[in-house]
């Protein structure tokens, strides 16, 4: 739809949120509200998007980047004034239309946007609005219709409405399409002769109606589609609905979610068929999970790729790649930058960071592997530590294929362990050591036994404590 410019209004503070963060940047299902709006507009086929920013505009610009163009509303003087700030970015010489949307209505999806635009074009209307009937419309403006025909007659802001008009339940959702030609001239005719002293965008269709031009209002089938969170209660409602929609989409695509009410999956997550998600699992960011996996329970995965046939149980995976057939957990932690090839096993209380792990590696218990490369088939014994940090710099550990690292081994980086080498349990080796392939490394201190010394040593400790305490 190259002949349509979308103008998204995102300049307001959102004071009812009672937050230091601008309302449109509050997250829903892992994505700021304005992100949902931009994505919905793009999925509807619109490429030319202008976002009107003001309060905390730097946050919005940082998030959206160059995906959109920007207009600035320095002073908050109403919705009509906000759209006017974008007028200079709308080319009226080529005809077409302008879509206006508030930046906080995430459930106006691409299908609804397409439906409104199609109805607008087919009717050759000057303006087309999307409306909804709410059980409790509160202080929102009301839509006025002819009681006999249902024809759209206009709208009235709540503060300007009569008691009878306030009983109307139909409201404008903040979404409208206008004919592009002459749109700026209409905006320049707006005035502030109302209770709030603001430039109302709805005055545009009042002007059009006075001129005898066609303005239509399309009513949404569901009140829930009009949900635009204004406070934390409504934000929680929106979050619950969006997550329910996300979970249902995955289930219809062949994913088993044992308890959808206790599973939290972000909007941009992809999951393959026949994967099973157990309760209390959180999957965030742009995570991709392959088919035939078992995820959870009590697992968190953030912006990672988990390939086919993996098991991730009671563990945390952050910004990492987990190859086919890997087993993670329970209680393992993959910190950012890990790459696991196929069939690796990372077990209880193991922690990895920036670790490249070869195929078939086993690291089952209480180990830390940081800034390390572990070759295929290596075995990492319980309690193995790569000491990679000296307080100033990080150093790498290289462990060759088929190497065997015994329990409670400290590898002081930088260190290289050759293919097939064996390091005996309890050894502390390195730094700057290169262990040859197939070598055996045993690091031991000779045990010293002093019979009867324990009692005298304990007595000395007691005396020292008494002297220190002055008793």
UniProtKB/Swiss-Prot annotation:
The protein's Enzyme Commission number: 2.7.7.23, 2.3.1.157
Write out the similarity annotation. Answer: In the N-terminal section; belongs to the N-acetylglucosamine-1-phosphate uridyltransferase family.
Q: Where is this region: N-acetyltransferase?
A: 254-471
**GO CC annotations, alphabetized:** cytoplasm; membrane
User: Which top class of enzyme applies to this chain?
Assistant: transferase
Q: Does the record bear Cell wall biogenesis/degradation in its keywords?
A: yes
Enzyme active site:
365 (proton acceptor)
Provide the protein name: Bifunctional protein GlmU
Q: Where in the cell is it found?
A: Cytoplasm
Q: Which cofactor does it need?
A: Mg(2+)
Q: Which reaction does it catalyse?
A: alpha-D-glucosamine 1-phosphate + acetyl-CoA = N-acetyl-alpha-D-glucosamine 1-phosphate + CoA + H(+); N-acetyl-alpha-D-glucosamine 1-phosphate + UTP + H(+) = UDP-N-acetyl-alpha-D-glucosamine + diphosphate
Q: Where is this region: Pyrophosphorylase?
A: 1-232
Cross-referenced Gene3D superfamilies: Hexapeptide repeat proteins (2.160.10.10), Spore Coat Polysaccharide Biosynthesis Protein SpsA, Chain A (3.90.550.10)
Q: Which GO terms of the molecular function aspect are on file?
A: glucosamine-1-phosphate N-acetyltransferase activity; magnesium ion binding; UDP-N-acetylglucosamine diphosphorylase activity
What is the protein's major site of localization?
A: cytoplasm
Residues given in the record as Mg(2+) binding sites:
104, 230
What are the record keywords, sorted? Acyltransferase, Cell shape, Cell wall biogenesis/degradation, Cytoplasm, Magnesium, Metal-binding, Multifunctional enzyme, Nucleotidyltransferase, Peptidoglycan synthesis, Repeat, Transferase
User: At which positions is acetyl-CoA bound?
Assistant: 382, 388-389, 425, 444
Q: Give the cofactor note text.
A: Binds 1 Mg(2+) ion per subunit.
Indicate whether Transferase appears among the record's keywords: yes
Q: What does this protein's UniProt record list under function?
A: Catalyzes the last two sequential reactions in the de novo biosynthetic pathway for UDP-N-acetylglucosamine (UDP-GlcNAc). The C-terminal domain catalyzes the transfer of acetyl group from acetyl coenzyme A to glucosamine-1-phosphate (GlcN-1-P) to produce N-acetylglucosamine-1-phosphate (GlcNAc-1-P), which is converted into UDP-GlcNAc by the transfer of uridine 5-monophosphate (from uridine 5-triphosphate), a reaction catalyzed by the N-terminal domain.
């Amino acid at each position: 739809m190259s002949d349509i410019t979308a103008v998204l209004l995102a300049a307001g503070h959102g004071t009812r949120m009672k937050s230091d963060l601008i309302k449109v940047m509050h997250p829903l299902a892992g994505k700021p509200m304005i992100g949902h709006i931009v994505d919905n507009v793009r999925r509807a086929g619109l490429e030319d998007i202008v976002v009107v920013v003001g309060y905390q505009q730097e946050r919005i610009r940082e998030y959206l980047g160059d995906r959109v163009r920007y207009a600035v509303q320095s002073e908050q003087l109403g919705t009509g004034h906000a759209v006017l700030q974008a007028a200079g970015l709308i080319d009226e010489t080529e005809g077409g239309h302008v879509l206006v949307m508030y930046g906080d209505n995430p459930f106006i999806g691409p299908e609804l946007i397409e439906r409104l635009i199609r109805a607008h074009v087919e009717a050759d209307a000057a303006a087309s609005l999307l409306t909804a009937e709410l059980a409790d419309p509160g202080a929102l403006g009301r839509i006025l219709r002819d009681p006999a025909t249902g024809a759209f007659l206009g709208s009235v802001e709540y503060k300007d409405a009569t008691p009878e008009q306030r009983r109307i339940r139909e409201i404008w959702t903040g979404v409208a399409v206008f004919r592009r030609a002459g749109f700026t001239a209409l905006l320049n005719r707006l005035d502030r002769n109302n209770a709030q002293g603001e430039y109302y965008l709805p005055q545009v269709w009042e002007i059009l109606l006075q001129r005898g031009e066609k303005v239509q209002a399309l009513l949404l089938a569901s009140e829930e589609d009009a949900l635009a969170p204004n406070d934390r209660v409504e934000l929680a409602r929106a979050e619950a609905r969006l997550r329910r929609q996300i979970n249902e989409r995955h289930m219809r695509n062949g994913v088993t979610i044992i308890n959808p009410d206790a599973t939290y999956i972000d909007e941009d997550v992809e999951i393959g068929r026949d994967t099973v998600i157990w309760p209390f699992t959180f999957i965030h960011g742009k995570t991709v999970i392959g088919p035939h996996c078992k995820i959870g329970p009590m697992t968190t995965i953030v912006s990672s790729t988990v390939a086919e046939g993996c098991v991730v149980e009671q563990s945390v995976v952050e910004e990492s790649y987990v190859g086919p057939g890997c087993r993670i957990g329970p209680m393992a932690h993959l910190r950012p930058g890990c790459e696991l090839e196929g069939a690796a096993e990372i077990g209880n209380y193991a922690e990895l960071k920036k670790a490249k792990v070869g195929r078939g590696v086993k690291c089952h218990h209480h180990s830390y592997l940081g800034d390390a490369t572990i070759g295929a088939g290596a075995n990492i014994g319980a309690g193995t530590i790569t000491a990679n940090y000296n307080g100033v710099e990080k150093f790498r550990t290289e462990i060759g294929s088929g190497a065997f690292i015994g329990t409670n081994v400290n590898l002081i980086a930088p260190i290289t362990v050759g293919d097939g080498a064996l390091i005996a349990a309890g050894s502390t080796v390195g730094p700057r050591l290169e262990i040859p392939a197939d070598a055996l490394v045993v690091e031991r201190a000779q045990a010293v036994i002093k019979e009867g010394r324990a009692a005298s040593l304990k007595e000395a400790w007691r005396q020292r404590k008494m002297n220190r305490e002055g008793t």
